[in-house]
């Protein structure tokens, strides 16, 4: 969710052609950039979706959701990403989210996910959690 230019989705799809990867974003330019990257890399296992609701095809079936919500926006957007993540993931599925503001996720991500952990790499933080 929030695929942006598609770097993470393209890397996952290229790494394992057996994966089915969905890239979702609300910005048409981001979706187009991801589609171009998928085509240039000849990735038939990467589907790209433009949506403003964080809805995904086949909710409750995803093993992994990666999220890259805006770093300096209202946390209402983060809540929408987490709502969409829970709808997308199957039970036991994982979420990995990138942020520069980990404290909010440390305090609140447990409302959506269990076993929440935060890892730091430079100025970025990865938040990992699992759907019950």
Regions found by a protein language model. Name each.
Residues 12, 84-85, 109:
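Class I S-adenosylmethionine-dependent transferase superfamily signal
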Residues 100-112:
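Conserved class I S-adenosyl-L-methionine
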Residues 119-132:
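Core SAM-dependent methyltransferase catalytic element
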Residues 92-99:
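Conserved beta-strand signature within the Rossmann-like core of class I S-adenosyl-L-methionine
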Residues 1-67:
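Conserved SAM/SAH cofactor-binding pocket of Class I
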Residues 25-29, 77, 100-101:
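Short beta->alpha hinge that forms the Motif I/post-I loop of the SAM-binding pocket
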Residues 23, 97, 118:
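Conserved SAM-binding loop
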Residues 79-91:
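A short glycine-rich, Lys/Arg-flanked "PGG" loop and its adjoining helix->strand segment in the class I
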